[in-house]
């Protein structure tokens, strides 16, 4: 009977724990204070088009906050809310100077990370964590965000970080009044806003192209989640296998089905921060529009015409032609509007929006350097997200 009673009590305790979405681990130091904070991450917005990436993919459903004194984690609390987490309240911690608040949002195994318990981790251990680019984090639900405060002082009692003036009582400690802690996305985004096909006269009577698919090529596989630069490793992913060329990485999985999709305006992908440095085997990220090159809208090439197009480098043996855009690359035919543009790198929290004008046949080696005069114009912009509008013309 006693065993049954204890078993039922245990079940009741488990049920109560399962319903509690504010999970606070026991601090590893004696506590005499609590910290509450609010965050600033932009307005949540849902995708309304199946292929589109929106500028305001900022919804937070899970937020872990940690208080550090040097390397020691003095407090930790996780809050989950399907409708959006904007604050964490009552983190138990110890008073003192030079405290740092570190937050990680939307971090779990579905977001490309491990199912990690942050409890007891040193500051260096948290900052050393990495994530992978996965199919799951092509959903805005799993866009990881991170933030870190400057050093501040916690006083005994109740502390509020980033709250407006007048919060709490006169005995409470207001820190960074009105300046909510900023969190930013670890991912970047790239999308094709539109493709305009207007073949020049020397091509228009012999070639026809209509966009069919969009693919991400040479996309970084891993990323740090903290640091001035998040670029990590030399492993890459791609959505379609093409003939290897100068930019093709040594460590490359180019058969990733979710990095290709049917062409539509605003189609794109969430990607990782990356840097282009040839000497260090670091390659440029490419957003590629491709499809069948034909003689006319209703007529395929004859075998002789196909052979000639392949020999010219316009398409592969299946008549597929590619229009690659090196994202945020400082190259011929690329123009930009906005900030952080033409840097030969992909930066976190930037959305690279590409407009493409096609004036002639593409290439059969999209992972190779573009000719000095290619049939491509690219235009790009930057806001926050930060949006980079890039325009390219393929001549």
Curated annotation (Swiss-Prot):
Q: Which InterPro entries match?
A: FimA_C, FimA_N, Fimbrillin
Query: Where is a lipid covalently linked (S-diacylglycerol cysteine)?
Result: 19
According to its UniProt record, where is this protein located? Fimbrium; Cell outer membrane
Flavoprotein among keywords: no
* Lipidation feature positions (N-palmitoyl cysteine): 19
The propeptide segment or segments lie at: 19-40
Keywords carried by this UniProt record: Cell adhesion, Cell outer membrane, Fimbrium, Lipoprotein, Membrane, Palmitate, Signal, Virulence
Q: What else is known?
A: The name (major fimbrium subunit) does not indicate the abundance of the protein, but is derived from the greater length of the major fimbriae. In strain ATCC 33277 and strain 381, major fimbriae are 300 - 1600 nM in length and about 5 nm in diameter. In contrast, minor fimbriae are only about 80 - 120 nm long. This length difference is observed only in a small number of strains, including strain ATCC 33277 and strain 381, and is due to a loss of function mutation in FimB, a protein that restricts fimbrial length in other strains.
**The protein, known as:** Major fimbrium subunit FimA type-5
Organism of derivation: Porphyromonas gingivalis (Bacteroides gingivalis)
Its lineage reads: Bacteria, Pseudomonadati, Bacteroidota, Bacteroidia, Bacteroidales
Q: Which gene encodes it?
A: fimA
């Amino acid at each position: 009977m006693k065993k049954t009673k204890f078993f039922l009590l245990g079940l009741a305790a488990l049920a109560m724990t399962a319903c509690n979405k504010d999970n606070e681990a026991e601090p590893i130091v004696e506590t005499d204070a609590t910290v509450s904070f609010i965050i600033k991450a932009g307005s949540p917005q849902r995708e309304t088009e199946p292929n589109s990436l929106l500028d305001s993919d900022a919804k937070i459903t899970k937020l872990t906050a940690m208080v550090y004194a040097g390397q020691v984690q003095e407090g930790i609390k996780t809050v989950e809310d399907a409708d959006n987490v904007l604050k964490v309240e009552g983190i138990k911690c110890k008073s003192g100077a030079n405290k740092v608040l570190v937050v990680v949002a939307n971090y779990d195994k579905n977001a490309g990370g491990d199912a990690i318990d942050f409890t007891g981790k040193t500051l260096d251990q948290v900052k050393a964590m990495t994530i992978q680019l996965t199919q799951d984090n092509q959903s805005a639900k799993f866009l990881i965000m991170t933030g870190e405060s400057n050093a501040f002082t916690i006083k005994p009692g109740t502390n509020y970080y980033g709250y407006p003036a007048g919060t709490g009582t006169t005995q409470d400690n207001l820190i960074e009044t009105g300046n909510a802690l900023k969190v930013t996305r670890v991912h970047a985004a790239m999308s094709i806003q539109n493709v305009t096909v207007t073949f020049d006269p020397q091509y228009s009577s012999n070639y026809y192209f209509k966009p069919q698919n969009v693919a991400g090529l040479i996309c970084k596989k891993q990323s740090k989640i903290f640091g001035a630069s998040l670029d990590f490793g030399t492993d890459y992913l791609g959505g379609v296998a093409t003939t290897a060329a100068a930019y093709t990485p040594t460590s490359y999985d180019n058969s990733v089905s979710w990095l290709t999709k049917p062409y539509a305006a605003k189609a794109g992908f969430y990607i990782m921060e990356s840097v282009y440095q040839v000497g260090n085997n670091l390659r440029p990220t490419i957003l590629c529009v491709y499809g069948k090159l034909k003689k006319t809208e209703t007529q395929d090439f004859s075998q002789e015409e196909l052979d000639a197009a392949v020999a010219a480098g316009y398409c592969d043996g299946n008549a597929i032609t590619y229009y690659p855009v090196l994202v945020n690359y400082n190259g011929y035919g690329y123009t930009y509007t906005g900030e952080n543009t033409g840097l030969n790198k992909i930066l976190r929290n930037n959305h690279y929006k590409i407009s493409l004008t096609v004036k002639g046949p593409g290439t059969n080696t999209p992972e190779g350097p573009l000719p000095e005069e290619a049939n491509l114009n690219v235009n790009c912009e930057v806001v926050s997200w930060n949006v980079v509008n890039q325009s390219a013309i393929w001549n």
